[in-house]
Amino acid sequence: MNRESGEPVFLVGLELPGRGIWTPKDSLAELSELAESAGARVCGQTLLRVRRPNPALLIGTGQAEEVVTEAARLRAQAIVFDAELQPRQQRNLERRARRKILDRTALILDVFARHAGSAEGKLQVARAQIDYLLPRLSDLWVQFSRTGGGIGTRGPGETQIERDRRELRARLSVLDRQIERLRSRRSIARAQRAEAGLTVALVGYTNAGKTSLHAALCGDADPGEPRMFATLDPKVRRAELPGGQLALVIDTVGFINRLPPRLVAAFRATLEEVESADAIVHVADVSAPHLTERVETVVSTLEDLGLADKPSVLALNKADRLRAGESPPLPGGMLVSARTGAGLDVLRDAIGKAAAADWQQFDVELPYRSGALLERIRSSGRIARLRYVGDRVLVQGSGPPALLNRLRRYASPESIHT
């Protein structure tokens, strides 16, 4: 998509059977946000009801003609469908429209490509793009491959498609190796962070203000520009919790309704940061429409990833946009504002308690000259009692598994327990 020119696009919303908790109108509004985030200019849109999806076009023949006519009238350069089109459907629609046909996945990929900043992020986007292109490549060359089968009847089109397939699959192999190397480095970095103390991951629906809240919690003066999928690469900063305890706070990629599985897989490195965290802060935009549906989308995604059982806190961000005296729309959520700082101290306290949910108690006897280790206990755990006896320091407290592993040499087996 030509992002710099504000390419005019026509959007097609669809009311399909079994679409889920989002209404077609809401989903179309979100598609419009995605298009604008990709640098496009929405010149028009329509909402179609599809009782029985057409295998050839997804929509009915008459509906397709109406879409093509309206897109041409508005001089749209591309038509974007709020669904995942099959390669055959995309090709047939392009033939009728004589202009680009994109689906929801292609649009999200375009946004991802625009916002990927790190080498790892760019590699993951490139891999997802090739994975998306491969089945469409087959359909693109389908006419050439129908030149007949058998020896002596294979046409040049069949040779070309096989060559293109090989090149793309070879590129996938290269990308996979590069991503795996970066993934290994990130794994080492995670292990080092675990040694340093608590880790907390911010998750949430895209554009919920995760990056702004991350900056506010960590004292960063530049929260960045609010936009969909502003963060594709995990960002790690240090934050201080009540009592002087330190935590590493990780900003992660946002979720979205009907996020294609191939994109979830492409960003597994980002999601591994959530998996390794001691606690999760689920950030939601309290002023956004359909707040409950957005929260449910994130919770459902976490469940699919096997992360629903992690200790978590629900932070209802952008509370400064609520009317005075207006109560939280979701029970159990904490009202905060990254912009004004309201509620951040209470949130820090809740983060500390959530992260400590799986801590273990310890009772250790340290050498007298253990200043560095004591400081480590203070920053990444909690000290309940400290006594100096002769040339020894007796410490009772609690902490995360990484800290207790460090302290085992100073304790008898029964003195470290859950």
Residue ranges of each PLM-predicted region?
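Short, acidic/turn-prone active-site loops that include or flank metal/cofactor-
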Residues: T105-L109, M228-F229, A338-G341
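Switch I (effector-binding) loop of TRAFAC-class P-loop GTPase G-domains
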Residues: R186, A191-L198, A216-L248, I256-A269, ...
